[in-house]
Every structure is written in C-alpha cells, then in structure tokens.
C-alpha cells in the first residue's frame, strides 16, 4: 500500500457482544464504580474493600469523601440539624457559564453549595459543624460559602458552642472574583469574635486544603488536626519552585511535613477522628 493510499474501513466490533460456536451472546457489563484506582499504591481496589471510611486496605491511602459520608462517619446518628440552607448563589460578575455550571453541579451532588453547616453531637458532645465537599466545584470558596460559615460562627457565639470545620478546597472561586476573596477577611473576623467569646474552634484539614481557605480560617483553629497525607498549601508546588528557584522536598505541602514544622497539631486517622474530636471538645468544656 502506498503512503497516501486510502485505507480499507475497519470492522466495528461491539465490545459488549461475543460470538461463540456461531451463537451471538451478550457479554455482561462491569459496573463503572465497582473498582477504584488507589492514587497511593496505584492498585485497583474493590469498592467494598474500602469500607465506609474509604481507606485503601493495601497502603492506607485516605480517599476523598462527600459531606454526607463525612457526617455518617462523624456525628451521632440523627443528631445533625442543618442550618442556613436556601442561600442562593449569585453571579456578580456575569461570568460566562457560571450559573449553568452551578446548576449541573447541584444536580450531580445534591448539594446547594460547597459547604454543609449545622449543629450536631459527636459522641455526645454538642458542636456547631461545617463540612466542605470537594465534589462541589472543588469546594471553592464563594460568597455563599463565606456567608454560611460566618453565620455558623455567629450562631455558635449565641449558643455558646464550639465550632468544628472539616476543610477541603481548591481556593477562592474565580467566577466570583474579588467577592470571593473578601470572604477570607469576613470569616476571619467571625473567628476572632468567636475566640473573644472564649469558645473553642477546631479545624480538620482534609485533602485538598489549599488557596484562600488555607490562608484564612483553615489555619486559624485553636487546634488543627489533619488526615494522613492531606495536601495543604496556598500556592501550587510548581509556582513556589519557579519563585524560589529550588527543588522542594517530595513531601512538601503534605500534612506530615506541616506537622513536623509546627503548622499542624496532630495527624489523625479517619476512623479515629470522631473519638479524638469528642475528647478534645470534652477537655474544653463541651456541651453535653
């Protein structure tokens, strides 16, 4: 065949059908979510083997989980009362495609926004609680996220409650521009008022916690916990390396690296978080 000769058409084969002994058979399909590839050991893991906590049985890699899954793992059954629902996200900059992206994400996740806020008990200890969900536009911080978390702190001050926040974020939401950035100062001011009231604020850093969330309320907790191998940082690794013109350590911006350098108080396995949080709340006058 010459270099520019037209190739013969390929025969198209249906991958879900098989012919054996002249009989056309339908091949059973494997469900898409039956297995998960572990980012840690790179192995294909049977979903059921991950368990409720979503931890790799081979290398103990901690998978990302949704806000609902986090609630099921952390709070006492039936104790969670959600607050500040129905706050609508706007498009202050008329950013193209933003509202469509929000609508698609809401339908896919079943969430109204990237954070779930409310009040619950953890092993009998009552607390105000916020859980960020990376499935919602990478839990980016926009005006509604800022408003819900600020209102949670204000509610906690009124009710004299501690605050526990599970952070996870790619940073400020670019579609909202400066309106998203101002949430850093807004939430930080609420954290300060809560602290002035003599109340405990505890953060749990989960993968990933980056950008403006790291630069504000994520690192302002009286006690800062983190899940193993959590990515924690402000700017990205490549940006930092290009700025300082140095090669960074392999574990740079990992929870273990930050604990070694004094930025994280303790690294706690996901299966032990509820007990650890409850113990800390009880030490600091938690409400029964």
Language model segments and positions:
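N-terminal alpha-helical interaction blocks
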Residues: 1-24
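Residues immediately within or flanking Cys/His clusters that coordinate Zn2+
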Residues: 35, 53
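Short cysteine-rich clusters marking metal-coordination/redox-active sites
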Residues: 38-41, 56-59
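Short Cys/His-rich "knuckle" micro-motifs
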Residues: 47-51, 64-70
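Long, charge-rich boundary regions
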Residues: 67-139
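Cleft-lining beta-strand/loop regions that shape enzyme active-site pockets
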Residues: 116, 121-195, 202
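Conserved catalytic cores of soluble enzyme domains
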Residues: 170-288
């Amino acid at each position: 065949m010459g270099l520019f000769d037209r190739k013969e058409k390929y025969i198209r084969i249906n991958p879900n059908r098989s012919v054996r002994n002249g009989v056309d058979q339908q091949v059973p399909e494997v469900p898409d979510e039956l297995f998960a590839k572990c980012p840690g050991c790179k192995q294909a893991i049977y979903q059921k083997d991950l368990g409720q906590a979503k931890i790799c049985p081979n290398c103990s890699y901690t998978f990302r989980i949704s806000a609902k899954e986090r609630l099921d793992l952390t709070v006492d059954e039936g104790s969670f009362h959600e607050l500040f629902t129905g706050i609508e996200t706007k498009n202050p900059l008329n950013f193209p495609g933003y509202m469509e992206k929000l609508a698609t994400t809401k339908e896919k996740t079943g969430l109204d926004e990237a954070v779930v806020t409310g009040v619950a008990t953890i092993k009998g200890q009552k607390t105000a609680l916020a859980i960020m969900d990376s499935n919602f536009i990478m839990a980016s911080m926009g005006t509604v996220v800022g408003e819900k978390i600020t209102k949670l702190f204000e509610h906690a001050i009124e009710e004299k409650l501690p605050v526990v926040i599970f952070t996870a974020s790619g940073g400020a939401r670019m579609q909202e521009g400066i309106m998203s950035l101002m949430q850093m100062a807004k939430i930080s001011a609420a954290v300060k008022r809560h602290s002035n009231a003599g109340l405990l604020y505890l953060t749990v850093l989960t993968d990933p916690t980056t950008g403006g969330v790291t630069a504000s309320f994520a690192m302002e907790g009286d006690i800062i916990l983190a899940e193993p191998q959590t990515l924690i940082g402000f700017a990205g690794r490549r940006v930092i390396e290009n700025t300082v013109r140095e090669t960074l350590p392999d574990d740079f911006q990992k929870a273990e690296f930050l604990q070694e350098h004094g930025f994280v108080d303790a690294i706690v396995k996901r299966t032990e978080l509820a007990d650890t949080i409850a113990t800390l709340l009880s030490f600091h006058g938690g409400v029964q």
